[in-house]
Amino acid sequence: MNTFSILTAQIGMFVIYMLAGVILIRTRVMNRENLEVISKFVIKLALPVMIFINTVNGVERKTLFHSLSIFLIAGIMYICLFLLSYISGIFFHLHGNHRQLYSAMSVFGNVGFMGIPIVTSIYPENGMLYICVFTIIDQLMLWTAGVRLTSGTDSQKNRFDFRKLINPVTVSILLAVICVLTGIRLPDVLNNSLQKIGQTATPLAMIYLGGVFACIDVLKNIQRLDYYGIVILKMLLFPLFFYVLLGYLPVSSEIRTTMALTSAMPVMSSVVMMANAYGSDGDYAMGGILVTTICSVFTLPFIYWIFHFIG
């Protein structure tokens, strides 16, 4: 099976997971309250465990230091995406909570739930290493700048609070880095158990999204033009620009493709969870996730095909 077929197979699995969520809601096996329980499980346990165990098992101290170029690449990516989100927000005349959420949606992609399975299926030997190193920066950015952008514009809520940085995800990153640097290895029973828990993150996150999609006004959301600004800029034009740019840097073709694909991911599902938790407009964020996730079924294979065409 070639890499393009592997990519489309992974996306097909995502679609099936989301359809399962839709069916569960439509048949009333689950309701919106049940979905919130799933979201809490994913964001407070499954996702942190997945990040921790994948980093501990996929990154070694030597390779961590040799992969520092990914930190630089991630920094360049975020700077460019923040600038694009600012310009795009002005173009669509967005204000207040929507302006902040639009920036968050334009910057943070669904790397954890979609990027990891896609990249590791394409590059089974080194893909996890690349994603794990990137995830350190990605999650730190999400839980610093992301928390600020997904907080309500009310001055009290929008004020920076150091305590918001202390959460299951940042703790899992810190513990993982300590394990990598010290060479600590987990007992097999604990390692295998955590792997099983972490493996539930992607299916449950996609089922959650499908269920929420079944609860919202799809027609209303797909008519908002500003969401398609994210699709065009973040998911199509920027990944192509980024792929060409990385071609001029001394990085391997695998890192080049991995980072460009990472930048093309749809809106991170954690954005809507954080928007609801921090008093912003979760429905607006969910609309962005709906549109970009549906479009990603077509944009990700297209982008990957263009990468191969460019060479």
Q: What is the predicted role of each segment?
A:
Residues 1-311:
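Alpha-helical transmembrane segments of multi-pass small-molecule/ion transporters
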